[in-house]
Amino acid sequence: MHEYSIVTALLELCENHAKSNKAKKVTKVVVALGERSGVEPQLLESAFEVFKLDSVCAESELVIETKPMKFRCRSCGAEFLPKGIDFGSCEVCKAPNPELVGGKEMHLQSLEMEAEDEG
């Protein structure tokens, strides 16, 4: 399951951001996840719940924002979101084989952190 390695990298990113912002903990982690990213949201959530326990994210909530597929026509350049399961042609000019330009991504969208107490 590659979700484990993804969560490990995600937690490392969170640790780095918390350290550079002098935060004592991360309370919310928001991830953008394309519907064609190849990552299972439920497995990602499960792995996060287990791996976060020994990190700055121990008490954090994981929010996954699903990003839809987006296509660009190779002929007319139109960008569109597919309607239904037939996305083999441009919805504007009907040319075949549009390019998938969105929905494959996965990235850290935002973090909510709690600052260290100043003393």
Swiss-Prot record:
Q: Which cysteines are joined by disulfide bonds?
A: none
Record keyword Lyase present? no
Kindly give the InterPro entries that the UniProt entry links to this protein.
Answer: HypA/HybF
What is the protein name given in its UniProt record?
Hydrogenase maturation factor HypA
Q: Which organism is it from?
A: Wolinella succinogenes (strain ATCC 29543 / DSM 1740 / CCUG 13145 / JCM 31913 / LMG 7466 / NCTC 11488 / FDC 602W)
The positions annotated for binding Ni(2+) are H2
Where does the chain bind Zn(2+)? C73, C76, C90, C93
Query: Does the record carry Thylakoid as a key word?
Result: no
Q: In the record, what lineage is assigned to the organism producing the protein?
A: Bacteria, Pseudomonadati, Campylobacterota, Epsilonproteobacteria, Campylobacterales
Family matches, as NCBIfam families: hypA, PRK00564.1
Q: Which residues form the signal peptide?
A: none
GO biological process: any one? Answer: protein maturation
